[in-house]
Design a protein with these regions (language model features):
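Auxiliary, metal-adjacent structural segments of Zn-dependent hydrolase domains
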Residues: 21-91, 109, 114-119
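Hydrophobic h-region of N-terminal signal peptides that target proteins for export
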Residues: 10-19, 332-334
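Outer-membrane beta-barrel translocator/channel fold
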Residues: 120-131, 301-399
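Metalloprotease/metallohydrolase-associated module, dominated by Zn2+-dependent proteases
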Residues: 23-38, 125-232
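C-terminal membrane-associated helical module and adjoining short loops/tails
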Residues: 185-303
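Outer-membrane beta-barrel "beta-signal"
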Residues: 280-288, 314, 359, 391-410
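Short loop/turn motifs that connect adjacent beta-strands in outer-membrane beta-barrel proteins
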Residues: 166-176, 244-267, 289-295, 319-327, ...
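Small-residue-rich helix-interface/hinge motifs
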Residues: 82-137
């Protein structure tokens, strides 16, 4: 009874405090890490989406006849293939290489030698890749971080993207291919790529080496991958926004659906797995839309064949403090097995409980047709693994500009 009362009061407070507002941020942080890349990449996609809504026609034949039914979808498909596909692949691939693998190597004290970008099929059949120089002191778990970093950074990017899409409850087609690439970078790569040098295969071999046995078989990881691919409803909405709503119907965006629990409360579950330096964690994400608020609760745990680990995470977006000031809150607590890594040639060991909390303050200057303002993120993380953050403990400080430009055509 007491728990229900506390929950009711809590939900009432966050409901009263204003209206949801998706926003895009151009931020800076000292280490130029994965959150820096994720926020700024989403801002780039928003700018491209806004320019597309103003400048690109959805049809070249205005009359409603058989020619329009055939020609207009061909025009839209050609535009998608020759611009969206190539631009999206470049942004997401370079994010994977530079701010994924590259960031984790720089964090370990190594250096980036070169990054080679190869265009996607059918233009080439070669993978893009990064060459790096390893530091003298480098643990196997830092090797695991380097291997998982590419897919990890695209999880960070699509977490930001998903948050904005759910706040608006609309999926603009210009984000569709990016979401499919980023959110499925880890499960898709794991399920379908068989090259022995591929990151998931190297990761699995490193985990088995770490524990001196074979707790991770390829068939098990493929099973987790297919579950993740087919239990994310956002994959369906991304495909629909691109191939049905845009190409066939000529729409700029489409409404997404959530499970209606009441007149005020909606719900969207999804499953994914995350690679960590101690093995994959299975993650159960739950998004709640309460009136105009978005809340996320997640729980994750290790595979049964690996050392025990668990994590509880909560995010709340858009707590309105005044007409101009809003607040986002993020926190997580975990229990992790042993992690060893070098920093500045000093061996650091972490095991057991850890926490991370971040508060984001948004100050809006203008809220007419377009939104402009400032954002500041401040928080703390203890030593241990959290997606997108450094391994070592320390303060988290990020800041920059926020904006949202109104689309001309929807």
């Amino acid at each position: 009874m007491k728990t229900k009362l506390i929950l009711t009061i809590f939900l009432s407070i966050i409901t009263i405090l204003g209206k949801a507002q998706s926003r895009y941020s151009i931020i800076y942080e000292k280490q130029l890490g994965q959150n820096f890349a994720g926020e700024n990449s989403n801002a780039v996609f928003h700018l491209l989406d806004y320019a597309d809504s103003l400048l690109m026609p959805k049809q070249i034949i205005k009359a409603e006849n058989i020619f329009a039914i055939v020609i207009n979808p061909i025009f839209r498909f050609s535009k998608l293939f020759l611009s969206n596909y190539l631009i999206t692949d470049y942004i997401m691939t370079m994010n994977h290489e530079r701010f994924g693998h590259g960031y984790r190597m720089l964090e370990a004290g190594g250096s980036i030698d070169k990054i080679v970008y190869n265009m996607p099929p059918p233009f080439t059949n070669e993978f893009s890749y990064i060459n790096a120089t390893y530091p003298v002191n480098f643990t196997i778990q830092q090797e695991l971080m380097y291997r998982l970093g590419g897919s990890e950074t695209n999880l960070v990017l699509t977490d930001v993207m998903r948050k904005n899409i759910l706040l608006d409850e609309r999926f603009n087609y210009n984000f569709g291919l990016a979401y499919l690439y980023g959110s499925n970078d880890m499960p898709g790569y794991t399920a379908f790529v068989t090259n022995p040098a591929a990151d998931p295969i190297q990761y699995r071999q490193n985990i088995n080496q770490l524990y001196g046995s074979e707790p991770l078989a390829r068939d098990k990881m493929k099973a987790y991958s297919f579950i993740a691919l087919f239990t994310d409803p956002m994959n369906f909405y991304a495909l629909k926004s691109v191939f049905y709503d845009y190409i066939i119907k000529g729409r700029h965006s489409s409404k997404i659906g959530m499970i209606k629990l009441s007149n005020r409360l909606k719900y969207l579950p999804r499953f994914r797995f995350e690679y960590t330096p101690y093995g994959p964690e299975l993650v159960y994400q739950n998004y709640f839309k309460l009136d105009y608020k978005l809340i996320q609760f997640s729980f994750s745990h290790s595979d049964a064949a690996l050392p025990d680990s668990w994590r509880v995470l909560a995010n709340i977006w858009n707590i309105k403090l005044s007409n101009q000031i809003s607040l986002n809150l993020s926190g997580q607590i975990w229990d992790q097995p042993n992690i060893e890594f070098y920093q500045n040639d000093k061996l650091i060991t972490s095991e057991g409980f850890g926490v991370q909390f971040i508060s984001t303050v948004n100050y809006d200057i203008s809220k007419d047709k377009n939104l402009y303002g400032f954002t500041l993120q401040a928080g703390y993380k203890s030593t241990g693994y959290a997606v997108g953050e450094q391994l070592n403990k320390g303060l988290i400080i990020r800041g920059g500009l926020t904006f949202k430009l109104g689309n001309k055509s929807l």
